[in-house]
């Protein structure tokens, strides 16, 4: 294997990783770790964080190598800049000079130079369950890279937003799919920017924006956002058609509180908010839901496998049983939601999973058990833009 410098930060990062028990998000665990080790400077913390996340992104691959070698492989595949840290770690100039290449090209170079052998199914778990239309290798190796920072510009504030960012010399990019989808620098302080403070933009991943663009709201229709979370899709929906009669629900009041704060910032007051457990057909809250809706958004709980580039530690804790449990929960939720969807109404089923058990398998089960027409289903994959991967199916109730 190639020679690397066993930097002392490797030892700290490995100690941090070995102490993690998967009971909380790694980001929260790492924050506590740094608080317990205040002598680590900001540069060391940044490098340790990068080492840890690189390690998780490698998944279970390369276990035939030592921990130090695995750490170096992971760092090389995921590192995106030439700096003093990378130059101290890698001794081979070919590695240093190629560090800006795409991870797949870097892996090919490691194969050529050192006969490196990594199995894709070890980098990403249960590849046999992944949606067939997803370009698997591209998806897996893109997972070594951080997600880009995307915002959605509200159409009526497009000129003001562009002017503000241009005046402040912000290095932004507009995505070719929409002049309202903008990429900002990863380290940009969005929440203190003029467009955010004035409510001209929303932080929303590109794939989520593209999913929301499939909604087709008509004036005065009744819409239900059943698993509303922080309300990003509802906000996009209201920007498309402000006159809809909107109800948002979720399983906990605390989730809806966050949504309400976000709606308040956007001066949105004309909506209904309810705590409902849609997975429980016998729930009092469920049985009290008597309205019929013209359209329902069911962005259901899932494995989150399309977002694991953000939380790569989850690749090491997922099991097939967990994926199947999500599938059963998703069917239960949507099965109950169909009771409040009027005939001719649209059900928008979505996940941020790449596993077919949670996507087309659930949709096929719904279509086979109900009078539904599947009019559209797709994997939303914008790999070249380093965004999340999502799934969407639109069904009409007959």
Residue ranges and their predicted role:
Residues 1-398:
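S-adenosylmethionine
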């Amino acid at each position: 294997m190639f020679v690397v410098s066993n930097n002392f930060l490797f030892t700290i990062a490995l100690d941090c990783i070995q102490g993690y028990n998967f009971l909380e998000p790694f980001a929260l665990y790492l924050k506590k770790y740094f608080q317990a080790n205040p002598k680590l400077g900001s540069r060391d913390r940044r490098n340790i964080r990068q080492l840890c996340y690189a390690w998780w992104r490698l998944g279970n691959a390369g276990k035939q190598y030592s921990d130090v070698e695995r750490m170096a492989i992971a760092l090389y595949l995921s590192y995106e800049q030439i700096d003093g840290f990378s130059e101290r770690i890698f001794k081979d100039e070919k590695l240093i000079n190629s560090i800006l290449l795409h991870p797949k090209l870097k892996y090919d170079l490691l194969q050529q130079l050192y006969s490196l052998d990594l199995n894709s199914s070890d980098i990403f778990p249960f590849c046999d369950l992944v949606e067939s239309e997803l370009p698997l290798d591209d998806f897996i190796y893109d997972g070594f890279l951080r997600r880009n920072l995307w915002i959605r510009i509200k159409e009526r504030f497009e000129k003001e937003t562009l002017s503000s960012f241009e005046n402040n010399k912000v290095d932004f990019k507009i995505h070719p799919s929409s002049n309202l989808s903008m990429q900002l620098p990863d380290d940009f302080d969005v929440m203190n920017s003029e467009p955010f403070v004035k409510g001209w933009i929303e932080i929303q991943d590109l794939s989520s924006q593209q999913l929301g663009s499939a909604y087709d709201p008509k004036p005065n229709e009744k819409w239900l956002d059943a698993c509303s979370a922080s309300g990003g899709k509802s906000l996009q929906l209201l920007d498309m058609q402000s006159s809809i009669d909107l109800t948002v629900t979720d399983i906990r009041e605390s989730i809806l509180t966050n949504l309400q704060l976000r709606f308040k910032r956007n001066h949105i007051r004309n909506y209904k908010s309810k705590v409902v457990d849609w997975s429980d057909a016998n729930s009092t809250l469920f049985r009290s839901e008597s309205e019929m809706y013209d359209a329902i958004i069911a962005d259901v709980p899932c494995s989150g496998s399309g977002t694991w580039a953000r939380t790569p530690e989850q690749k090491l804790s997922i099991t097939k049983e967990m994926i199947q449990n999500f599938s059963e929960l998703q069917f239960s939720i949507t099965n109950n939601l169909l009771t409040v969807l009027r005939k001719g109404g649209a059900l928008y089923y979505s996940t941020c999973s790449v596993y077919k058990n949670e996507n087309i398998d659930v949709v096929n089960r719904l279509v086979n058990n109900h009078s539904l027409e599947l009019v559209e289903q797709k994997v939303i994959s914008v790999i070249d833009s380093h965004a999340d991967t999502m799934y969407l199916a639109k069904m009409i109730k007959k």
